[in-house]
Amino acid sequence: MKDKIIYDFSYSSTKINEKETRRNDFIKITNNKNISAMSKIVKPNKKIVEIKKDEINNTETLIVNSETSFILKKLGMKQVTQKTIMLFDFLTEELLANNSYKQVKNIDPKVSFSLEYYAELFGRKFDSKYVRTALRKELTEEFSRFQSMKIVIKKEDGGEVSLSLASGYNTSGKTMSINLDIDLVRMILNSPLTILPKTSFLDNENYELSKKLSTHYHLDGNIKKGNNNILSVKTLLEASGTKIPSYDDVMSSNRAWKKRIVNKLDEILNKISKQQGIEWEYCLAKKEPLEVQIKDIKTYDDFLKLYVKYEYKND
């Protein structure tokens, strides 16, 4: 039996009574091609389906789906945002600049980068003292948030291991740096981590879908099976989170599901395609071409049966 991992994103001062567990530990892979670590931790862009309040302990548990939850203080706590997730993904990738997959000795938990590099990577302006000050403040707040977060690993013997995300940071001067928890770094270096296209960080709005396309495409197991370049429409809609409305929401309003769901997915995929050099098209389950044009699909159920075939032109 594998250890159960609980991803507890409360501040350390918050008492937690309710937690969601994951039954699967990090999977073993080869050739240093791994899945984004943060996607294993929390997915706040999913549509919230339930909120459980604990007035006594001053917490709210936002149940996102059957496998994932994250804990927030009811008062005064900043949420785990999309920006937080993107920054954590960026930091885990930067770890590989000074460390290697499965490394055991001489691990360097410190990640350093210039403020200008951060601005360029995330598509931010860097043309005035005011902007640079704002960026520095933003990173200070995010790093402070990391230092207050933790991961709890439940062991099968009934015990648990608590890991902080960071032990310290420095956002003064030209170089930004953060010391990630050494035990967390060991876990990251032994967990699935895919190097995402740098352009992924430019698009905050569609980041999760962009990451889904990249991680699925580059995972060794999918490459060996020959299905790394095809994803179902249903999976893509789920990865888009709240950016595309649900069918039920559409049908309870103007009922224009093609315009609000199909066209919106097309729009997002075209934007990602332009940013990352992806060629894509709709297809059937075994990559066969469609027998009709997408505009002629009659029902939403028929649309859900479709797949998207795609290739990274620069790979």
Named regions from a protein language model:
Residues 1-315:
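Charged, alpha-helix-forming regions
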